Amino acid sequence: MTDAKYVLCRWGKRLWPAKVLARTETSAKNKKKKEFFLDVQILSLKEKIQVKSSAVEALQKSHIENIAAFLASQNEVPATPLEELTYRRSLRVALDVLNERTSLSPESHPIEDGITLSQKEKTDADVASQVSSAPSPSLLGEDGQAVVAQCASKRRSEYSSKSLLPSSALEDHLRCQVGPKTGLSESGAGDKSQDDSGLQLDHGQESTTKKRQRNLGEKPTRRRRSESGLSKGESVLKSQGQASSCVALASPRPPSQTRDEEPCAGVKGCDWVKSSGNIRPLSASERSRGCPTKRPRLDGGQNPPTRQLGTRTVGAAPCPRSCSGEVTMLCSAGAGDKPEEDPVSSEESTGFKSTHSLLEEEEEEEEEPPRILLYHEPRSFEVGMLVWLKYQKYPFWPAVVKSVRRRDKKASVLFIEGNMNPKGRGITVSLRRLKHFDCKEKHALLDRAKEDFAQAIGWCVSLITDYRVRLGCGSFAGSFLEYYAADISYPVRKSIQQDVLGTRFPQLGKGDPEEPVGDSQLGQWRPCRKVLPDRSRAARDRANQKLVEYIVKAKGAESHLRAILHSRKPSRWLKTFLSSSQCVTCMETYLEDEAQLDEVVEYLQGVCRDMDGQVPERGSGDRIRFILDVLLPEAIICAISAVEAVDYKTAEQKYIRGPTLSYREKEIFDNELLEERNRRRR
């Protein structure tokens, strides 16, 4: 544990991957047990901690996969979003470090000829102990044909990554291995001293060979390595000009062991049998009971045996239950024949080159990141989602899903605008017309919207970004519409609301709220939805009528006005009137109906005539201004206090605030201003 460079330690409440910086040995009571302290640094963080060597584990890829699976199975995030992202980024860095170390390990690179076997490859000792000395293998048979070289795959995947051993080490191994780290140049020497003895295989390996065949079938990565190694071997053979000789790699075995050791002995589909310690090709009758007869070549000969790459073959179908991963090559000419170019071999070499290039492309592909770091676009639409929607002639625009009707496959959405009403109903559209906000076409949709509405779409994106940032840091928890209506979004909303006259938004959702006109069939008449008038103004007028009746008919404010004129009650309105020298051209009257305002002003004029001697000298000179600046506010405040049963201060504050306008009234007023501005520009 103390030799590991990367460990898995507990920090806080989680297991974090860390890098070992230093090791410190401490004295323990028991001298036989040594205790170490490790100074480690959390990956992707600058946090450095000290842990005991007994409390850590060597970092392995399986640890990262188990943690990722555990995080994916959790329904709720145990920490804040920012801490969760930091933790997952640390896991990602740890996984990259492990993959990089695997790619740079000695077993992942080919070993040059002549380099001795590494000490770390002692795992083959139990297999090499079963090997006995024997004559060197031969390359040619009795009939001048090439002999098959069948190499059994090794037990584990790391065996397939070991390099080809030199000739002195061949006696210590059970079989030759052709993989991505194996070269065939050594076996392609073609010494004539090896042309006198038959090919012999190991004893007692038939059962283990079958097991390895199944293992190879379950792991396609081994097949990929074998294919790559075979392609490299072909290139070496061609470079040495051995077009008329066959290369067969096998460990030397005594003849007495060959029959029991033959991997394909007793198995249908093999084209070679053992006879008197040698291997001979099957006859036509014997071959008719085994593998199908080979197709005749165009030049009258027989096709060479198939080259088997794992479970895939090049040029012919594989023999059933044949040794997967073994390499079978046949000479195209005998010892006395003249070497001539084989038209089929050129096709096969082209196939090998294409296969080799495909394998290299597969190995060079970037590794897919873990699931926890990938964004998966949701398949369905939920309430509160941010989407794109195209409305009429305008480009796609961001919107919020307010409600979803699964049975009708429709959703009610609300476009994001500068004067958006979060409580608005929105428009109903088909789910097929919606696109997720983070879809693949997001940048294209943004560019299209910026062509005509650059400032407006920029503000929408800023609003959405601010909402997501506040969700991530935990300063806000809720839907987008709740965020828009809350005070926390005011800084972003203020930037566009202050410039509402200068920012042009598309006229979205102004037509039929059920379906856009773009979906209707040509020439089909669709009834227009009747928009009800705004009732807010009428409700305020009815409430103000009670104030007018209290002032005019009941004369409830007359005693209050006389007390102010006689200076028995203080009045801020009278004090402001006497101290101000400017003429106010616009004032807030609180009463919105002109008839109600005229009725109250006419009554106050009568009060001034009755109290002519009590009106201040300044008020006598400008009686209309005195009535509007002093008597009208005092009369309305007194009426509000009496009708609504509140004190004078509360009634005064309500008068100063003025009437509460609805969202539709503000929208109508803004549209009127825009129309007036456009009319003046023309």
UniProtKB/Swiss-Prot annotation:
Residues 127-140 have a biased composition (Low complexity). Residues 383-444 form the PWWP domain. GO terms for biological process: chromatin organization; DNA repair. It is found in: Nucleus. CDD domains: PWWP_MUM1-like (cd06080). GO terms for cellular component: cytosol; nucleoplasm; nucleus. Residues 121-145, 179-318, 334-369 are annotated as: Disordered. It holds the Pfam family PWP3A-B_C. It comes from the Eukaryota. Transmembrane segments: none annotated. InterPro entries: MUM1-like_PWWP, PWP3A_3B_4, PWP3A_3B_4_C, PWP3A_3B_4_N. Residues 203-220 have a biased composition (Basic and acidic residues). The modification Phosphoserine is found at residues 105, 168, 345-346. Residues 346-357 have a biased composition (Polar residues). Keywords: DNA damage, DNA repair, Nucleus, Phosphoprotein. Gene3D superfamilies: 2.30.30.140, 6.10.300.20. GO terms for molecular function: nucleosome binding. Interacts with TP53BP1 (via BRCT domain); the interaction is not dependent on its phosphorylation status. Binds nucleosomes. Interacts with trimethylated 'Lys-36' of histone H3 (H3K36me3) (in vitro). The PWWP domain mediates the interaction with nucleosomes. Involved in the DNA damage response pathway by contributing to the maintenance of chromatin architecture. Recruited to the vicinity of DNA breaks by TP53BP1 and plays an accessory role to facilitate damage-induced chromatin changes and promoting chromatin relaxation. Required for efficient DNA repair and cell survival following DNA damage. Belongs to the PWWP3A family. This is PWWP domain-containing DNA repair factor 3A. It comes from Mus musculus (Mouse).
